[in-house]
Amino acid sequence: MAAAPIQQNGTHTGVPIDLDPPDSRKRPLEAPPEAGSTKRTNTGEDGQYFLKVLIPSYAAGSIIGKGGQTIVQLQKETGATIKLSKSKDFYPGTTERVCLIQGTIEALNAVHGFIAEKIREMPQNVAKTEPVSILQPQTTVNPDRIKQVKIIVPNSTAGLIIGKGGATVKAIMEQSGAWVQLSQKPDGINLQERVVTVSGEPEQNRKAVELIIQKIQEDPQSGSCLNISYANVTGPVANSNPTGFPYANTAEVLPTAAAAAGLLGHANLAGVAAFPAVLSGFTGNDLVAITSALNTLASYGYNLNTLGLGLSQAAATGALAAAAASANPAAAAANLLATYASEASASGSTAGGTAGTFALGSLAAATAATNGYFGAASPLAASAILGTEKSTDGSKDVVEIAVPENLVGAILGKGGKTLVEYQELTGARIQISKKGEFVPGTRNRKVTITGTPAATQAAQYLITQRITYEQGVR
């Protein structure tokens, strides 16, 4: 058990942590009072332990390998058992998959070393601001992620890692050279787990992980949370980030907002400013969810002054609830942003900022004359909504948009990929008139969107925002 740091010549020196397996299996004295009461122990037969880590989606494929060959070989070489959550089953509030490793101490370290190496091999296209595929928002990640390790541990293990007065975590940092942080501990409500974030160079992280695994080994309760899916977990879940709100955003507003940011193609827009005014009137969970969404949009380069949010509290609550309940979170994001924009337009809100900055404008704003949301300087002034009507059987909406010939390629994408992805994402059918077939008297092509009201609204929103972006960068 690590003791408190001792004073030597005016400097604090952490007590070294012995990496050899401890002889005693008794519960260490510094375990916090919040430790779970479960009887389940960490070890199985033959000294087996468990390590749960988060893996960025871009690294999962290289860890699994073609047909699962890599992960099978890794298990064979190390003797460990490795389980990953499903491809779209992310840890709440992130786009990272959960990996559970079972094995000896040596196996845990070996497997994690392999995983860390794959995380460091971030593909060039992943580091770009705009995702390679708009159906995979998780491909846009923080470049600093390659220098991080994220480990999920039960509360009891977290207490051992921290140590009395923070002595143990300080010793881990001093001995490894890595920076170690734990997700915030909430007041009142106990979380079953907390997330440990280790940041540093490869060798520093390797050493820190070894020391953390030793603490896992010491805690007889560290095998109490072996789930890899959080889809059905009730109650609060720890935030994957070491600072800020203690709880993860289980309503999926954060990843869906990130998805929408990539879909719209916005990158490196005007600087972000404070936005307390748009949050007035919101409280509780709504405020947390909206703040998370806005923070995510800000991190993706949106100028929050140009959002023009005029959404009422009642409308926001409904939109957020719909997003949380959606089976397709990316589509929910598009609908959520569209709801913000159209509600703002209906209430007469206008986008702030100067001409040339882009707003998350209303769907009806394809022409400045419709509602003035974009203003006279809008690059979409050349586009127009030709009409909205019901399909012949009355079950679907049909929306027609006029798009300048030179901007049609932005909607089509290479080989029609963007158009296909928009359709898959929203569930709407999108058709573009053939080359040379223009709206009479113009050089505009006709885009026809067919689907449910929500689907057509989302598709129309994505198309108009993509056009706005493309016009602005040309």
Curated annotation (Swiss-Prot):
Record keywords, A-Z: mRNA processing, mRNA splicing, Neurogenesis, Nucleus, Repeat, RNA-binding
Gene3D superfamilies documented for this protein: K Homology domain, type 1
Protein name in UniProt: RNA-binding protein Nova-1
UniProt motif (Bipartite nuclear localization signal) ranges: 26-42
Chain intervals for the UniProt region annotation (Disordered): 1-43
Nucleus in keyword set: yes
Domain of life of the organism encoding this protein: Eukaryota
Pfam family, one: KH_1
GO cellular component term of the entry, any: cytoplasm
PANTHER family in alphabetical order: KH DOMAIN CONTAINING RNA BINDING PROTEIN (PTHR10288)
Protein location: Nucleus
Comp. bias intervals (Polar residues): 1-12
GO biological process, one term: regulation of RNA metabolic process
Domain notes: The KH domain consists of approximately 70 amino acids and includes a conserved hydrophobic core, an invariant Gly-X-X-Gly motif, and an additional variable segment. The third KH domain (KH3) binds a hairpin RNA loop containing the 5'-UCAY-3' motif on targeted molecules. RNA binding by KH3 requires residues C-terminal to the KH domain.
